[in-house]
From Swiss-Prot:
Binding of substrate, residues: T158, K184, T195, E285, N408, S413
Protein name: Arginine biosynthesis bifunctional protein ArgJ
Gene that encodes it: argJ
Organism: Mesorhizobium japonicum (strain LMG 29417 / CECT 9101 / MAFF 303099) (Mesorhizobium loti (strain MAFF 303099))
MF terms (GO), sorted A to Z: glutamate N-acetyltransferase activity; L-glutamate N-acetyltransferase activity
Entry function: Catalyzes two activities which are involved in the cyclic version of arginine biosynthesis: the synthesis of N-acetylglutamate from glutamate and acetyl-CoA as the acetyl donor, and of ornithine by transacetylation between N(2)-acetylornithine and glutamate.
Catalysed conversion reaction: N(2)-acetyl-L-ornithine + L-glutamate = N-acetyl-L-glutamate + L-ornithine; L-glutamate + acetyl-CoA = N-acetyl-L-glutamate + CoA + H(+)
InterPro entries: Arg_biosynth_ArgJ (IPR002813), ArgJ-like_dom_sf (IPR016117), ArgJ_beta_C (IPR042195)
Alphabetically ordered keywords of this record: Acyltransferase, Amino-acid biosynthesis, Arginine biosynthesis, Autocatalytic cleavage, Cytoplasm, Multifunctional enzyme, Transferase
Length: 413
């Protein structure tokens, strides 16, 4: 957790409402950080449904394996998250650590270890010493309070400079239901996964298979469309918990992902996921600018996304944005290297509403002065039209500054 808050941090945070059936507690376990919370326990009433998506890394952490195993049953009672140590690439010791944590949390909550979910974030390759926090779990589980959402977001931070929270309240049938979410992430952020760490809870009575469908679809245009540094984490975990408590107030129980009554909920969940994903981008390590990259006119939507990610992940594009240099030639380079169908002589490029290149050459109306003024903004939009089809996609990233190098060069020291 940095002491210097990102200039792109939210100017204000939403008031996070209570989700019936969820209790939260945090503690200072001293796993890596001093004088700050680094342990989170989220406790759910019996009957809570759960769904999740995880990293696609071939080197997943021990907690990711633990969660994948437990997810099949679709029920959750406890979530335990630690920051400062990822418990990844830790072999047998890592598996033993998750087992011990799961057993301690289950004993504290009076449930089975199969209803416990774990997540860890921090340094890779160092064994996680569960003795630093396992004795704290009983107190956390019993002392949880329903209104500590921002405190929960703070406890899971690593190099983040601010806590990331989002909320939406919508109708399910004729009844209000609430969706709350927290997230962490600032570096080792790239798509093709879930997210860094993110946890969503709702009081809506939605079955686990439906939650899984909603989450898998919802991440495609949110968390799977953000990148800070093109590095996919070993620990990426996104879990959603549904306590079902709104059923007492008349909310209909949803067991079919095609249920028409899900429309508003699906859109609200999408807003929560997008808000959290963009907060991660805006807290990218050393970031000073958010960058939205849109590709249109590609052969397909998949092709458009690959080209957009090629642009968004290009160090040369990102450093040009950091230097407020409208170097559109680097966008041309990134399109060309993407390995997707493209036609040089049909390519057009915009920064904001300013067209810089058109049909394979610099736009005759190009103004260096106007473009330089645009590049001084905090939020930059880059668009590339490939000119060969109807495929389109949007991804988000941030600039690449010398602070990113400093943060990651000093991370373990």
């Amino acid at each position: 957790m940095s002491t210097t808050i990102s200039p792109l941090a939210p100017k204000k945070y939403p008031k996070m409402p209570v989700i019936e059936g969820v209790r939260i507690a945090t503690a200072e376990a001293g796993i890596k950080y001093k004088n700050r919370t680094d342990l989170l326990a989220m406790v759910f009433d019996a009957g809570t449904a759960v769904a999740g998506v995880f990293t696609k890394s071939k080197c997943p952490s021990a907690p990711v394996d633990f969660c994948r195993q437990n997810l099949a049953a679709g029920k959750a009672r406890v979530l335990v998250v630690n920051s400062g140590n990822a418990n990844a690439f830790t072999g047998k010791k890592g598996r033993e650590s998750t087992a011990l944590t799961g057993e301690a949390a289950a004993k504290a909550a009076g449930c089975t270890a199969g209803e416990v979910f774990l997540a860890s974030t921090g340094v890779i390759g160092e064994p996680l010493d569960t003795t630093k926090f396992s004795h704290l779990l009983a107190g956390l589980v019993s002392d949880g309070k329903p209104d500590l959402w921002t405190e929960a977001a703070k406890a899971i931070m690593t190099t983040d400079t601010y806590p990331k929270v989002a909320t939406q309240t919508v109708k399910l049938g004729d009844t209000d239901v609430t969706i709350n979410g927290i997230s962490k992430g600032a570096g080792m952020i790239a798509p093709d996964m879930a997210t860094m760490l993110s946890f969503i809870a709702t009081d809506a009575p939605i079955a686990a298979p439906v939650l899984q469908d909603l989450l898998s679809r919802g991440t495609a245009k949110t968390f799977n469309a953000v990148t800070v540094d093109s590095d996919t984490s070993t620990s990426d975990t996104l879990l959603i918990f549904a306590t079902g408590k709104a059923a007492k107030r008349g909310a209909p129980e949803i067991t079919d992902p095609k249920d028409a009554r899900l429309g508003q909920f699906r859109r609200a969940l999408g807003k929560v996921l997008k808000s959290l994903a963009l907060q991660v981008v805006r807290d990218g390590e050393g970031a000073r600018k958010q960058v939205e990259v849109t590709v249109t006119g590609a052969k397909s939507a998949r092709s458009a996304k690959r080209i957009a990610l090629s642009i968004a992940n290009s160090p040369l594009v990102k450093t040009a944005v950091a230097g407020e240099d409208a170097n559109w030639g680097r966008v041309v380079m990134a399109v060309g290297k993407a390995g997707e169908p493209a036609d040089r002589d049909r390519l057009s490029i915009w920064f904001g509403d300013i067209r810089l290149a058109h049909e394979g050459e610099r736009d005759p109306g190009y103004s260096e002065e106007a473009t330089s003024t645009y590049m001084k903004r905090d939020d930059i939009r880059i668009r590339a039209d490939i000119g060969i089809g109807r495929g389109k996609a949007t991804v988000w990233t941030c600039d690449l500054t010398k602070e990113y190098v400093a943060i990651n060069g000093d991370y373990r020291s």
